[in-house]
């Protein structure tokens, strides 16, 4: 058996304290935080709100103020009994909502939570209003899937977001593989948008009229719409939607615009040109499909403000924050911080009207089937148990 000298024992005792530092962008404090409260060299522990502090690039490493038991607004620490839509409304936002899909609505344990309109005040149909679901054959429309979710929203007193009119993906082959003149495709877009939006007239708060028009490098996607009509297809779709339902808000919805870059710049320039030409456009949707630990809340806030300055409202439309599996306590804690950062960014921008998660439970998340080895992206786990992320959301609305 080895015997440690007094000096070695003292050195060993110091090791945990040396190692117990949060990495850059890691959490370093806040109400309920039990992890490290100092940051690695070159970063500073900055308090964003009483519920979390984060190691941001800077010159010094300092500990955050000791957490108190109340929020800055005087409320108590959010608990798992919090109702997110109720909190969002109390904070001055229009809604907290979720996407859902028709196949999920046969799961009674799922719908028992989904139907709670104090938890979710808004619903987005994930797939049943897309082109392949609504006009699978030219001129032949079917609305059964969308109607089911629209009825659910009406029954529960929830806002409904329409998703979507024009998108490069999930198109029936007669559209995606068609060979059209500009006049023909213009008529096809007008008929599809008009028929779809008219069918749900008076039921939909906002439509994602155009979805994901740009590549990540800021160039336009080369799909049947752009290849045939150039950029004018956006105006065609927006004008058709406005004529069909003058009271619905009209959005362009995009991902990877949560930070400054070529894609965000291209979309911003499009917004400016559309507004200058008096083309109807009311909002920009920030999808926010994010990765744990790779996200800047202040960066998102800046982007929300930049777009809002163009005279449009903004919304978080498809929020989830994925991680490399398996999940760990550290990853779940960081995910809590990241969800809180998104809510805080929206809270700090008056024109950010609400937040929608892209389904609320890991059981029905799209992430594992799209990103190999990743998942656990939602605020509830696959057994419908609230994760730390839930409290991150609640704290953001309560701050």
Swiss-Prot record:
Domain of life where this protein originates: Eukaryota
Signal peptide residues on this chain, from the entry's feature table: 1-20
Thermal response of activity: Optimum temperature is 70 degrees Celsius.
Gene3D superfamilies: Glycosidases
Catalytic center residues: 212 (proton donor), 318 (nucleophile)
Key words of the record: Carbohydrate metabolism, Disulfide bond, Glycosidase, Hydrolase, Polysaccharide degradation, Secreted, Signal, Xylan degradation
Domain GH10: 81-396
Domain CBM1: 21-56
GO cellular component: extracellular region
PROSITE patterns: CBM1_1 (PS00562), CBM1_2 (PS51164), GH10_1 (PS00591), GH10_2 (PS51760)
Pathway(s) annotated for this protein in UniProt: Glycan degradation; xylan degradation
A single GO molecular function term of this UniProt record: endo-1,4-beta-xylanase activity
Subcellular location field: Secreted
pH-related activity note: Optimum pH is 4.5.
Protein function: Endo-1,4-beta-xylanase involved in the hydrolysis of xylan, a major structural heterogeneous polysaccharide found in plant biomass representing the second most abundant polysaccharide in the biosphere, after cellulose.
Cystine crosslinks: 346-352
Major localization listed first in the record, in broad terms: secreted
Documented EC number(s): 3.2.1.8
Name of the protein described by the UniProt record: Endo-1,4-beta-xylanase C
One GO biological process term: xylan catabolic process
Annotated catalysed reactions: Endohydrolysis of (1->4)-beta-D-xylosidic linkages in xylans
Residue ranges that the Swiss-Prot or TrEMBL entry lists as coiled coil: none
Family indicated by similarity: Belongs to the glycosyl hydrolase 10 (cellulase F) family.
């Amino acid at each position: 058996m080895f015997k440690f000298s007094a000096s070695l024992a003292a050195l060993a005792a110091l090791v945990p304290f040396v190692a117990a530092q949060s990495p850059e962008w890691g959490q370093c404090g806040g109400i309920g935080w039990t992890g490290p409260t100092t940051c690695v060299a070159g970063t500073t522990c900055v308090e964003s709100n009483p519920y979390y502090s984060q190691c941001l690039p800077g010159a010094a490493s300092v500990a955050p103020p000791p957490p108190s038991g109340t929020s800055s607004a005087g409320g108590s620490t959010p608990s798992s009994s919090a109702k997110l839509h109720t909190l969002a409304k109390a904070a001055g936002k229009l809604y907290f909502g979720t996407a859902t899909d028709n196949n999920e609505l046969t799961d009674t344990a799922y719908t028992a939570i989904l139907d709670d309109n104090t938890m979710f005040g808004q619903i987005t149909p994930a797939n049943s209003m897309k082109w392949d679901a609504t006009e699978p054959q030219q001129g032949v429309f079917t609305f059964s899937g969308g109607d089911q979710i629209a009825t659910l929203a009406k029954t529960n007193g929830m806002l409904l977001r329409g998703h979507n009119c024009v998108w490069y993906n999930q198109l029936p082959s007669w559209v995606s593989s068609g060979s059209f003149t500009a006049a023909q495709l213009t008529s096809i877009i007008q008929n599809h948008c008009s028929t779809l939006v008219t069918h749900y007239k008076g039921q939909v708060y906002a439509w994602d009229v155009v979805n994901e028009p740009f590549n990540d490098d800021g160039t336009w996607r080369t799909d049947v719409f752009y290849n045939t009509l150039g950029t004018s297809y956006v105006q065609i779709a927006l004008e058709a939607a406005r004529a069909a339902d003058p009271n619905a808000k009209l959005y362009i919805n995009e991902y990877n615009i949560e930070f400054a870059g070529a894609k965000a710049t291209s979309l911003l320039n499009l917004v400016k040109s559309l507004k200058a030409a008096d083309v109807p456009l009311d909002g920009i949707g920030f999808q926010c499909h994010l990765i744990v630990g790779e996200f800047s809340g202040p960066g998102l806030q800046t982007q929300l403000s930049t777009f809002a300055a163009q005279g449009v409202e903004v919304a978080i439309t498809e929020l989830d924050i994925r991680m490399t599996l398996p999940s760990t306590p550290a990853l779940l804690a960081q995910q809590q911080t990241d969800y809180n950062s998104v809510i805080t960014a929206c809270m700090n921008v008056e024109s950010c009207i609400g937040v929608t998660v892209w389904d609320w439970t890991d059981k029905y998340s799209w992430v594992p089937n799209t990103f190999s080895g990743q998942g656990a992206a939602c605020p509830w786990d696959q057994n419908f148990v609230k994760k730390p992320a839930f409290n991150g959301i609640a704290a953001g609305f309560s701050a």
